[in-house]
């Protein structure tokens, strides 16, 4: 554990853009080092007080769906090298589960999520801000595959949600947040050159912090 505050790398981009692939590529490169991943997806607001018919109306692509206050609190605690208890979201019940995941502080924190660059409070806590930029057609195919396989959705429901929610929210909130990125990575996890550049940059920042 270092004596300076951890390095925070923010990785944003639309749903299905390849954020997870970029995150994994960076994480794998530094495997064996002190590094963790903190996903914004875990910080959807608790909705246990709402009836199921209300929960089903949740717009998961709107900034107000996230409990960024808790995410910021946890990120600040990790920056102070304190353990946090990450919530777990149940997409079948559309609310938080009773489960929590203990997260130990590390020297490198990868913060991943569709709207992490939309909140200036989160941006202020990041050392590097990335935006993964991928063609819309590819993003919808990836989202369809994920939601059907991992979240028990039907193809019709995924397409309906994309047309009526995901695409308009992407255009209204996610795409505009791209201007806050330090680096834009086209083609997601397939862009090995951009990932190699990022790995080198992160290594340089870590070295500078150690030598402070």
UniProtKB/Swiss-Prot annotation:
InterPro entries: P-loop_NTPase (IPR027417), PRK/URK (IPR006083), Uridine_kinase (IPR026008), Uridine_kinase-like (IPR000764)
Residues reported in the UniProt entry to bind ATP: 13-20
Pathway this chain belongs to: Pyrimidine metabolism; CTP biosynthesis via salvage pathway; CTP from cytidine: step 1/3; Pyrimidine metabolism; UMP biosynthesis via salvage pathway; UMP from uridine: step 1/1
Protein name: Uridine kinase
Catalytic activity: uridine + ATP = UMP + ADP + H(+); cytidine + ATP = CMP + ADP + H(+)
Pfam families named in the record: PRK (PF00485)
Disulfide topology: none
Predominant cellular place of this UniProt entry's protein: cytoplasm
Cellular component aspect of the GO annotation: cytoplasm
Molecular function GO terms recorded: ATP binding; cytidine kinase activity; uridine kinase activity
Gene Ontology BP annotations: CTP salvage; UMP salvage
The entry's keywords: ATP-binding, Cytoplasm, Kinase, Nucleotide-binding, Transferase
SUPFAM superfamilies named among the record's database cross-references: P-loop containing nucleoside triphosphate hydrolases
Record-linked CDD domains: UMPK
Location of the protein in the cell: Cytoplasm
Family recorded in the similarity comment: Belongs to the uridine kinase family.
Keyword Cytoplasm on entry: yes
Higher taxonomy: Bacteria, Bacillati, Bacillota, Bacilli, Bacillales
NCBIfam families reported for this sequence: PRK05480.1, udk
Gene name of the record: udk
Documented EC number(s): 2.7.1.48
């Amino acid at each position: 554990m270092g004596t300076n505050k951890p390095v925070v790398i923010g990785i944003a981009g639309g749903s299905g853009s390849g954020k997870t692939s970029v995150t994994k590529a960076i994480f794998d490169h530094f495997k064996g080092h002190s590094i963790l991943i903190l996903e914004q997806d875990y910080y959807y607001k608790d909705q246990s007080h709402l009836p199921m018919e209300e929960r089903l109306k949740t717009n998961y692509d709107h900034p107000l769906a996230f409990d960024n206050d808790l995410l910021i609190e946890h990120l600040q605690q990790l920056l102070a090298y304190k353990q946090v208890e990450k919530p777990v979201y149940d997409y079948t019940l559309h609310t938080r589960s009773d489960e929590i995941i203990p997260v130990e502080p590390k020297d490198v924190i990868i913060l991943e999520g569709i709207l992490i660059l939309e909140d200036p409070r989160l941006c202020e806590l990041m050392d590097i801000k990335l935006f993964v930029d991928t063609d819309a057609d590819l993003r919808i195919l990836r989202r369809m595959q994920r939601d059907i396989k991992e979240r028990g959705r039907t193809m019709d429901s995924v397409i309906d949600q994309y047309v009526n929610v995901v695409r308009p929210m992407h255009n209204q909130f996610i795409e505009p947040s791209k201007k806050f990125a330090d680096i834009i990575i086209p083609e997601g996890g397939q862009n090995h050159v951009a990932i190699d550049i990022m790995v080198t940059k992160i290594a340089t920042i870590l070295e500078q912090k150690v030598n402070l």
